[in-house]
Structure formats: C-alpha cells, structure tokens
Amino acid sequence: MRKYSPLMVQGTTSDAGKTVLVAGLCRLLANKGIQVAPFKPQNMALNSAVTEDGGEIGRAQALQADAARVKPHVHMNPILLKPNTDIGAQVIVQGKAIETMDAWGFHDYKKLAMPYVLESFSYLSNNYECVVIEGAGSPAEINLRENDIANMGFAEAADVPVIIVADIDRGGVFAHLYGTLALLSESEQARVKGFVINRFRGDISLLVPGLEWLEEKTGKPVLGVIPYLHGLNLEAEDAIKSEQLDKGKFVVKVPVVTRISNHTDFDPLRLHPDIDLQFIGKGESLSGADFIILPGSKSVQADLDYVKSQRWDKDIERHLRYGGKVMGICGGYQMLGEYLADPLGIEGAPCSIKGLGYLSISTELQKQKQLTLVEGKLVLPNQSAVKVKGYEIHAGVSTNLGQEHRPISIHTKDAMRYDGTINSENSIFGTYLHGVFDEPEAFEAILTWAGLEKCQAINMHDIQEEAIERIAKSMEESLDLSLIWPDVFEKNKAY
C-alpha cells in the first residue's frame, strides 16, 4: 500500500471551515484513487452518528467518511464530547460512553485520553493510504494548551504537518492568521505549511496586497483562497438552521429543547420546497403548525420540564384537539409516553416522572446505550409498507402498556423486532429512529400521514453528493495542493 503524507487542518476560530475543508480534501484524494480516511482526535458536538460496529462518533466525521467514500469507523473520532448539562458532557472514547465529566474533570482526563487518540490515528495510518485530520476550535487557545489532544498537542505527538484556515467572511482574517501563528511555539510554527482563506466574496485582486504582506511577515505561503459557496446543503454539526415563514407551505414546527440532539434529523424537511420548517425557541408558540415534531434530547427529564415550562404541552393539546398530527423522535418519543423512570440516576438524581401521556408506553433509562444502524419496513395506517433506514442512540428502553400499533419492523441478524408506537386515534407517532426522514419512501409516508398532499421526497444522498463535489471542485481550482502532495496534484496558482 502506497503511503501519502497525512495533513491536519486547524482553524483560527470555530466554524472557520475545517469540517468542510477536510471533507473536500477527502473527496479530492478519493477522486484520485487514493484510500483516504478522515480523523478528528477530539470533537464536541450536539449530533452523533452510529458506526456499523455499534460505536458512536461525530456526524461531521461520518460526513467526511462519505466524502472519502469509506465507511465510518470509531477510530475516525476517538474522543467525542456530548454536552448533557450546562456544565457537563458525556465522554465517548473510541465509540463507547464512559462517563459524564465537567470541564475540570475532562481537563484532567486528557492526559489519559492521548494514548487512545494515538492508537486510533495509528489504526487509520496502517489501514489507509492517507489520513486528513481536523482540529477543534483554535490551536491558539492559551487556556487549553496543557495536555492538548485536539490541535497542536496532537500534531506534535503524531508529527503531522498542519495548514491553518480562516474565515474571511467574519472579517479580520489577517489578524486571525498572523495572531494564531504568533501564539504557537517555534516547533509548532515549523510544522505549519501554509494558510487557506475561506468564504471569500468579491474581486480577489483587491485581496492580493494583504496576501503578499502575510506571506512576507510569516514566511508561510497562502495555499489559496476558497470562494463563498452559496446554497451549500450539508449537515450542520451544531448550529440549528431555520427558514423564514413562507405562506402557503406545509408548516412543521419543532420545539427547541435545551438539550436537543441530532437536529440533522430535520434536514430533509428544511430543504423540501413544499415545507416550511420552523424551530421554535423560548417564549414562542407552537400554534399555527400543520405538524409538530418533538426532537431527540440528551436529557429527557429536564427537557420535558422545559416543554411544560414553555406551555408547549398546552400547544400540543390544542393542536391535537383541532385534528393536527404530532410525532416524537427518540427522546421526544419518550416524552409522549406515560412514564419515564431513571432508577440509576443516568440523567441526575434517581426519579420517576409522568410523561405527556399520549402514548401507552413506559420508559426506563438504563446504563447501556442502544447504538445500532437500522433497516426495516414502515407501515402507517392505511398505507403500504415502505423501506425505512436510520440509527438508534438511546439509553431508554420503552415498554408498550397497551395494544397500540407498532409501525416499524426491524430486521436483525437473529430475529425481527418492532419500533415505534401510533395511538389508537392515529394522531400521534413516536419512534426511536434518528434519520427516519432520510429514506425517500419513509419521508413520503410520514408526511402524507401528517397531512401534506401530493408529497414527493427529495433525495438527501444526492443533495449531499452534489455539495461535496462542489466543494472538491472549488478547492481543486482554488488551492495549490502540490505544496502538500506533490506526487498527486500539479502546481496551481494559489491566487
């Protein structure tokens, strides 16, 4: 197996474009026939993905794996932090949750985490021809430098070259790049191979004097300037994207609970031309919806209390009274049930609380998470069976207390099991499946059930592929990658 130099992409800030840049590089290398894998030593994210072997990684790394045309693997994101309280996060190591830690607890744990990070990087290096690495936040965070595993701490330990990307759309790009480099140690500065400027709009000739100044002052080349790409529809790692009200469309409202998880579930709705998806925040009402969906949550008890404090439970009651449909996904499904018990104190003090009482299920939280990819059939009332795909990430086990319809049959290696519940009035549907809208047939079935006439799904896979190829094409035209991989790319004018 031929080997190519690994490369780490670090950023001057969060949301500088690291995730997209790594995805684009993975696709460019894959298009050249190179077996490439993405890697992020440490990630903090609201959204996670399930691997085939039942592990949990950041959804951004799953997206990057798709860009590389390889299957997601737990070693692509060995340390994942999922915030579940204001001061704490669940720590997931090589795909498995170990415990919840506060900031100081994790700070102390990082020195123990580095061996896992290096083990995962070694696995990818041995099994792929190239590894493209994504940093986290900024390498110049002075307060986070001790025992760093996410940025230069990892780069030094693994001895990998680095490029630094900055978002010019935010302003202050030269200060960001110059200042970030200046705050690094001499050995760290030496492994920086160049800069990338992201999201540029306008005439690049006006930028050239600044680029020349930056190269002269730092002695580092600018590898290129990537233009702002409009309408780039990729999963958001953390930020919730909402659109403005568009009259005449089918209105879907999602209450934003404090610990919302996997809001990427709603991307197929957000992108559909006939749907107006609205994320409803604190102090806002769910009234006026055609369809209400309770999202997943990383702290179901606390978020159920929050739903009641916002009087969204009253909005749901009124919505149902006037013939509306309601759906719950994962934690939202649990909230719709009769009871939620936490005897082990998974989410806080041990307790048992009443749910919203719309579905005849009772849920008990358990220490072991259910982490699995799912494929099966969805049968909604008065509809034919359709294909459904998704993934499960939950600690709760729900028991049906009545004879309500279970609409999803899941095929496993050993047997068949069932997921979800629909009430006898056919107005409420709950499921544990994240990604339930991604399969076009399931999308159409659920939205037809909810009341959208002549529903025709969009293909999320095609949309993602188009976006990744756009990114790769733009980067190939904009960057001089011969400075990193001279055996793969021809010299290109950087600007």
Swiss-Prot record:
One of its GO terms (biological process) is cobalamin biosynthetic process. InterPro entries: Class_I_gatase-like (IPR029062), CobQ/CobB/MinD/ParA_Nub-bd_dom (IPR002586), CobQ_GATase1 (IPR033949), CobQ_N (IPR047045), CobQ_synth (IPR004459), GATase_3 (IPR011698), P-loop_NTPase (IPR027417). Pfam families: CbiA, GATase_3. Keywords: Cobalamin biosynthesis, Glutamine amidotransferase. The keyword Nuclease does not apply. The active site is at C330 (nucleophile), H434. Residues 249-442 form the GATase cobBQ-type domain. It comes from the Bacteria. PROSITE patterns: GATASE_COBBQ (PS51274). Pathway: Cofactor biosynthesis; adenosylcobalamin biosynthesis. GO terms for molecular function: ABC-type vitamin B12 transporter activity; catalytic activity. Catalyzes amidations at positions B, D, E, and G on adenosylcobyrinic A,C-diamide. NH(2) groups are provided by glutamine, and one molecule of ATP is hydrogenolyzed for each amidation. Belongs to the CobB/CobQ family. CobQ subfamily. HAMAP family: CobQ. This is Cobyric acid synthase. It comes from Aliivibrio fischeri (strain MJ11) (Vibrio fischeri). The gene is cobQ.
